[in-house]
Amino acid sequence: RLMAFSTLLCIAYLVANTLLMGFSLSTILVTTFVWCAFNVSVSIQKLVVAFLPIILFVLIYDFMRVYPNYMVNPIDTKGLYDLEMQLFGFNSTNGTLIPSEYFNNNHWLITDILSGIFYLCWVPLPIVYGLYLYFTKQKRICIRFTSAFLLVNLIGFAGYYIHPAAPPWYVMQYGFVPDFSIGGHV
């Protein structure tokens, strides 16, 4: 029964994903992996259930492409920039700068490396910590931790839609007018 339910769920996800976002081999591979992991053995099934909140996070994040935040509310390019300038702006030889403008002009290798590491760890580190909790027999804490991870990210997603904002690099490079022809930037 559980296998039939998980199979139906995976097929429904693949159909919805394909209809809304187009065919993707990576989606099929990930869905197949989750289905196999869920149906291989009871012990692995328990691991998948413990990490269901993180799987939900990934699915929700993926489906956010279907209805972009700028279709819900207008993108704020100036308001948050001005607020950051008031709260964190500081004087330099180039005038008053927000921190990202300052660090854009003053690269320090160690801060660039540390920033990159912290940025890259915001998803993998909680997953590793969740696995640590799970495999050290702290399954209840693992489930609470992964659920908290999902909740915090859902709050972030809500903020992303309630008040869409341009990142500091966008304002530095393109100004305050939204231009949807510009691609992503890392």
Q: Residue spans of the language-model regions?
A:
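Membrane-interface elements of multi-pass transporters and channels
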Residues: 67-75, 137-138, 165-170
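Hydrophobic, aromatic-rich transmembrane alpha-helices
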Residues: 126-133
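N-terminal transmembrane-helix/juxtamembrane module of multi-pass inner/ER membrane proteins
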Residues: 1-27, 42-126
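Small-polar-interrupted transmembrane alpha-helices in polytopic inner-membrane proteins
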Residues: 147-160
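Structural signal for membrane-spanning alpha-helices in multi-pass inner-membrane proteins
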Residues: 36-39, 130, 160, 164
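Membrane-interfacial catalytic/cofactor-binding modules of polytopic membrane enzymes
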Residues: 158-186
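Central hydrophobic cores of alpha-helical transmembrane segments in multi-pass inner-membrane proteins
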Residues: 28-40
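Membrane-interface helix-boundary motifs at transmembrane edges
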Residues: 38-49, 134-144
